[in-house]
C-alpha cells in the first residue's frame, strides 16, 4: 500500500526551503521572476516557522502542494492555524483582499477505512484500488463537490480549488476573525435558528440531494445572525446506502442541542419533515454501525 513519507521540518529552515523550491522550480509553470520569487520565499519561511512553533509536521509532498498555491498565485499568503484536529488542519490564508480557509488532510493519521466506506457507496467515484493516495484525493474531491453543491442552495462556504490533500474554500468570519460555532453562542433566538436549520436540511436533501452526515452545533457557524453549515467531508448523496442512517443521526444531534435550548424538537418529526417519510427501523438500527 503506497503512503507518503512523513518528514519533520528540518532544523535549518533555509535547507528545507532550498530543497522544496528546487523541486518547485523544476516545474515549468513555476518559473517565477526574481522579485516575486524572493517575496514567496519570505512567506514560505514564515509559514515553516509558524508550523514549527505550533509543532505541526507535514510530509514534503504536502508542503510542496501548499507552496505551489503561493507560486501559482492562487493564494497570497498563509496567516495562521484556525483549527487543528487529528485528521486535518485548517489554515487562514489570503487571496488578495479576500480571506480563505485552507483545509489540509493529514496523510499519516487519516482514517482511510472510514473514508473508503463513504466514498465507495458514492456513484460519483469509482475506486479501482484502495491506495491511501487515491482514497485521500477522492475524499478531498468529494468534499469539494459537496461544498460546491451545498453553497448554491444553503448558507455554506464556497469551495475554490482542491489539490491532492488540500482544499481551499471561502473563510467564514469577520475581517479575518473566525465566526463562532453555534455551540458557543448565547442569547440567540433559538426558535428562529431551529427553523432556519430545519429548512436548510430540507433544501439540502430535496434540492441538493445531499445529507450532511456530521451535522451538529459543532459544524454550524454563526455569521450575520445566520447559521452557516461547514465541514461537508462526510456528506453523501441521497442515493448512498448510508444516506438515511446519517440523516437520522443528524436529526438526533440537532434535536438534542435545541431541546437543551428549550425548543420543542423531535428527531422523528424532523426526519419526516425533511424526507416526507417515516423512519425505517433498519436505517435507525444502522446508526450504531456508523
From Swiss-Prot:
Which keywords appear in this protein's UniProt record, sorted alphabetically?
Answer: ATP-binding, Hydrolase, Kinase, Magnesium, Metal-binding, Nucleotide-binding, Serine/threonine-protein kinase, Transferase
Q: Which family does it belong to?
A: Belongs to the protein kinase superfamily. RIO-type Ser/Thr kinase family.
Report which reactions are catalysed by this protein.
Answer: L-seryl-[protein] + ATP = O-phospho-L-seryl-[protein] + ADP + H(+); L-threonyl-[protein] + ATP = O-phospho-L-threonyl-[protein] + ADP + H(+); ATP + H2O = ADP + phosphate + H(+)
In Swiss-Prot or TrEMBL terms, this protein is called: RIO-type serine/threonine-protein kinase Rio1
Segments forming domain Protein kinase: 76-290
Active site (UniProt): 214, 231
Which positions does UniProt annotate for ATP binding?
Answer: 82-90, 103
Molecular-function GO terms, alphabetical: ATP binding; hydrolase activity; metal ion binding; protein serine kinase activity; protein serine/threonine kinase activity
Q: Where does Mg(2+) bind?
A: 219, 231
User: What Enzyme Commission number does this protein have?
Assistant: 2.7.11.1, 3.6.1.-
**Which Gene3D superfamilies does the UniProt entry name for this protein?**
Phosphorylase Kinase, domain 1 (3.30.200.20), Transferase(Phosphotransferase) domain 1 (1.10.510.10)
